[in-house]
């Protein structure tokens, strides 16, 4: 594994990088795997992403770019399986991964990089069989999530906790998005600190770009045209939430905050919810019902998840992007919003403390009390000068994140795991 020669087996059992983020189980991890793979390929690596087939129409292999293949592995029925059902399909999935390597020259892959604990379980077997290092990214951790559950949310099962502990014990290297995540690995899972490496995710600065700065020729017309194209009012503040509609992501906090603002007679922004139900099929309907219950149905626009380029357009046209998650290992959407020059209001949890610089690129809210969120939104949306200052800071913060840097640092982790 010297020079540019590197072959990576990337494992993502429960969600494919080809799926639309913001729907089902697809989210920031999908973007992470896709963008990391692209950056690794630009550095000369070959990446093969193994994921579970969820449709008979999916071909065995999809080439998604130079040096990047997605391999669909049949493991269980294509439809009807919840993520919690997938541990029972890991044997079939692992067998499919091993068969792929068995058809090639021995020693084809240099490293296994697994994502999420399900993939880590399969990765342990593959890395052992191929005698290559296992590098693992948790993305989320059951013990962390269970420590910050929303009322009514279901805790992660003990089987997941045990599975995560096994992966942490066996992995040659663990990649954490932030120092806080690294600390969680050591504190909650007794990870060996010498095997934990902090590598920040990046952001696609070619897709997520700002509008022309205020005062530039045609800037006002461009902004108005962008809003008009999305059907947004030109003279109303807009707050965007982009993500899966589930209790963990806490869009209900925003809806309740709008209800509080309405009760106080405040001028309400338009809240745009971009995303579909995840976990519970009724999650979106329940959020719509909540908006009706608190009297803000006409002030919340529910739309399905959109492509990356369309998401950038929504971010550019928003006055604020809100990320009220109860637990977040990083919060990629927050950095993408800032790359568009849009300040972020986020919960003061986990990786969001790294993704958002409080007072410089956005505001971190210390809890999930709708009254506190209402106060923060009210104060920000009334202060155009402050929004403009935070917008400038958002661009500065986002400029420090790069997928090429992420790939470079990840390759170093691969190298260290190989020689350990």
Swiss-Prot record:
Transmembrane residue ranges: none
The Enzyme Commission number assigned here is 2.4.1.250
Q: Which domain of life is it from?
A: Bacteria
Q: What is this enzyme's class at the first EC digit?
A: transferase
User: Which Gene Ontology terms cover its molecular function?
Assistant: acetylglucosaminyltransferase activity; D-inositol-3-phosphate glycosyltransferase activity; magnesium ion binding
One GO term of the biological process aspect:
mycothiol biosynthetic process
Task: Give the residues the record marks as binding UDP-N-acetyl-alpha-D-glucosamine.
Answer: 20-21, 28, 244, 249, 306, 328, 336
Residues involved in Mg(2+) binding:
315-316, 318, 342
**What does the UniProt keyword field contain?**
Glycosyltransferase, Magnesium, Metal-binding, Transferase
State its role.
Catalyzes the transfer of a N-acetyl-glucosamine moiety to 1D-myo-inositol 3-phosphate to produce 1D-myo-inositol 2-acetamido-2-deoxy-glucopyranoside 3-phosphate in the mycothiol biosynthesis pathway.
Spell out the PANTHER family in the cross-references. Answer: SULFOQUINOVOSYL TRANSFERASE SQD2
Q: Which family does it belong to?
A: Belongs to the glycosyltransferase group 1 family. MshA subfamily.
In terms of HAMAP family, this protein maps to:
MshA
Q: Protein name, please?
A: D-inositol 3-phosphate glycosyltransferase
Upper taxonomic classification of the species? Bacteria, Bacillati, Actinomycetota, Actinomycetes, Micrococcales
The gene name reads mshA
């Amino acid at each position: 594994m010297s020079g540019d020669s590197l072959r990576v087996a990337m494992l993502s059992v429960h969600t494919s990088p080809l799926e639309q983020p913001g729907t089902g189980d697809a989210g920031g991890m999908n973007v992470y795997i896709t963008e990391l793979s692209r950056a690794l390929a630009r550095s000369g690596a070959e990446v093969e992403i193994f994921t579970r087939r969820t449709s008979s129409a999916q071909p065995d292999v999809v080439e998604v770019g130079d040096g990047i293949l997605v391999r669909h592995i049949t493991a269980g029925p294509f439809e009807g399986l919840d993520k919690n059902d997938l541990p029972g399909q890991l044997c079939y999935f692992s067998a499919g991964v091993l068969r792929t390597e068995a058809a090639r020259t021995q020693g084809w892959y240099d490293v296994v990089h697994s994502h999420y604990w399900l993939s880590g379980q399969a990765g342990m077997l593959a890395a052992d069989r191929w005698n290559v290092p296992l590098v693992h990214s948790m993305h989320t951790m059951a013990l962390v999530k269970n420590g910050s559950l929303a009322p009514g949310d279901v805790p992660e099962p003990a089987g997941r906790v045990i599975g995560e502990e096994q992966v942490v014990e066996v992995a040659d290297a663990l990649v954490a998005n932030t120092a806080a995540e690294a600390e969680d690995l050591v504190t909650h899972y007794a990870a060996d600190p010498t095997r934990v490496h902090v590598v920040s995710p990046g952001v696609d600065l070619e897709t997520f770009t700002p509008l022309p700065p205020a005062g530039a020729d045609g800037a006002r017309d461009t902004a108005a045209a962008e809003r008009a194209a999305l059907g947004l009012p030109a003279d109303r503040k807009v707050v965007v939430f982009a993500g899966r509609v589930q209790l963990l992501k806490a869009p209900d906090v925003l809806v309740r905050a709008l209800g509080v603002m309405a009760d106080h007679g405040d001028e309400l922004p338009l809240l745009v919810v971009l995303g579909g139900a995840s976990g519970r099929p009724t999650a979106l309907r329940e959020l719509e019902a909540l908006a009706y219950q608190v009297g803000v149905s006409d002030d919340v626009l529910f739309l399905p998840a959109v492509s990356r380029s369309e998401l950038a357009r929504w971010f550019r046209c928003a006055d604020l992007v809100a990320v009220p998650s109860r637990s977040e290992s990083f919060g990629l959407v927050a950095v993408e919003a800032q790359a568009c020059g849009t300040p972020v209001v986020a919960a003061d949890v986990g990786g969001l403390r790294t993704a958002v610089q409080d007072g410089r690129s956005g505001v971190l809210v210390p809890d999930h009390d709708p009254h506190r969120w209402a106060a923060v939104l009210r104060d920000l949306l009334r202060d155009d000068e402050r929004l403009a200052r935070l917008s400038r800071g958002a661009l500065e913060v986002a400029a420090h994140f790069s997928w090429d840097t992420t790939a470079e640092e990840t390759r170093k982790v691969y190298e260290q795991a190989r020689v350990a």
